[in-house]
């Protein structure tokens, strides 16, 4: 079997998410061709698929060492850096890609995803719009690519509370793909279903038709359309049907992922144990002038509404679900995916701390 055939096999494994097969096969070929940037890139993508981002970063850096203008490797490196919280480095790479090739759609899309991650929705919107404007001028672009970018744009508009723009984009998506589950679910989140509103009742019928068309094996779509239908019937106060669809969605998720209550209990006990004997008030850390309000609660328990009410005060800014606390905790107190109690104690005893 020649090299081209072997690489095609690896590409096929990558497409169907057989990431370990890709890594195993690439290692054999890289022993013979250690500087092949294409092989290094797909190996990095396989590690990326397994969330082994440190390994993926090594592969992408090796690819770029031998081929500095390999934009695919550069884009993938930016994605892995983004995944581990190195947002500035990721941002610089996306911008560098777009300087080299201003029409590189993946970079626009991924850079926009980064903007969304840090709640810069206006910045994300501009990047998604630019990606879409490029695609509009291209021939033979798969509908899934077009609707994918449009859906990201619609979600960014919604996050920026630009409802009319969101609805306009969703209509465009459904004109291309009437069965687009994400667009139907997003539509459902924007409207209040009512027996007196013909459009909303029509939308329920459309979603029920989409539900019939989806194979039960297509788990994510089935779950999303079931949640959307559950919400619509909840609005109509038809709780029997609402429960049917919500229960169906939950059962599908459970069947796929399962649940380990004992593991959850153990994780909670470990968190409590870590902080036993640590007096958080007895610290050398200088108090901050800025006061931070955390709003915690179970899903669908009213935390979003509570945040909106509190944020309506002139001296309060509602920041939404931020990633920064998670990044700081990960960087300073976690080793090998576990919190280290001694690190927390050491940090508490410092007089001044710069941890970002």
Q: Residue spans of the language-model regions?
A:
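Phosphate-binding active sites in nucleotide-utilizing proteins
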Residues: 286-356
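TPR-repeat structural position
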Residues: 19, 53, 87, 121, ...
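Conserved alpha-helical positions within TPR/SEL1-like repeat arrays
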Residues: 11, 38-49, 72-83, 106-117, ...
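Structural marker of alpha-solenoid helical repeat scaffolds
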Residues: 32, 66, 100, 134-141, ...
């Amino acid at each position: 079997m020649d090299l081209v055939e072997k690489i095609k096999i690896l590409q096929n494994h990558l497409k169907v998410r057989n990431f370990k097969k890709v890594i195993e096969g690439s290692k054999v070929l890289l022993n013979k061709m250690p500087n092949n940037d294409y092989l290094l890139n797909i190996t990095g993508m396989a590690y990326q698929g397994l969330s082994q981002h440190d390994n993926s970063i090594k592969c992408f850096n090796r690819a770029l060492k031998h081929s500095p203008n390999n934009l695919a490797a550069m884009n993938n490196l930016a994605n892995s850096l983004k995944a581990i919280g190195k947002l500035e480095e990721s941002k610089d790479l996306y911008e560098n890609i777009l300087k080299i090739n201003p029409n590189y759609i993946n970079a626009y899309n991924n850079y926009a995803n980064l903007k969304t991650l840090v709640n810069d929705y206006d910045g994300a919107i501009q990047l998604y719009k630019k990606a879409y404007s490029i695609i509009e001028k291209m021939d033979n672009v798969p509908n899934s690519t077009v609707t994918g970018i449009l859906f990201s744009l619609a979600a960014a508009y919604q996050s920026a509370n630009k409802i009319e723009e969101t609805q306009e984009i969703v209509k465009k998506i459904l004109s291309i793909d009437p069965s687009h589950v994400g667009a139907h679910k997003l539509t459902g989140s924007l409207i209040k279903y009512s027996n007196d509103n013909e459009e909303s009742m029509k939308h329920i019928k459309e979603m029920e038709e989409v539900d019939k068309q989806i194979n039960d094996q297509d788990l994510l779509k089935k779950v999303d359309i079931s949640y959307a239908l559950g919400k619509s019937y909840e609005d109509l106060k038809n709780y029997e049907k609402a429960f049917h669809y919500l229960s169906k969605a939950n059962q599908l998720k459970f069947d796929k992922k399962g649940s380990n209550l004992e593991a959850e209990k153990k994780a909670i006990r470990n968190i409590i144990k870590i902080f036993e004997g640590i007096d958080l008030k007895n610290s050398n850390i200088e108090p901050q002038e800025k006061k931070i309000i955390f709003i915690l609660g179970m899903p669908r328990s009213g935390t979003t509404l509570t945040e909106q009410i509190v944020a309506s005060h002139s001296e309060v800014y509602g920041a939404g679900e931020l990633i920064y606390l998670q990044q700081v905790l990960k960087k300073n107190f976690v080793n090998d995916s576990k919190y280290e109690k001694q690190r927390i104690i050491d940090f508490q005893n410092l007089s001044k701390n710069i941890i970002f």
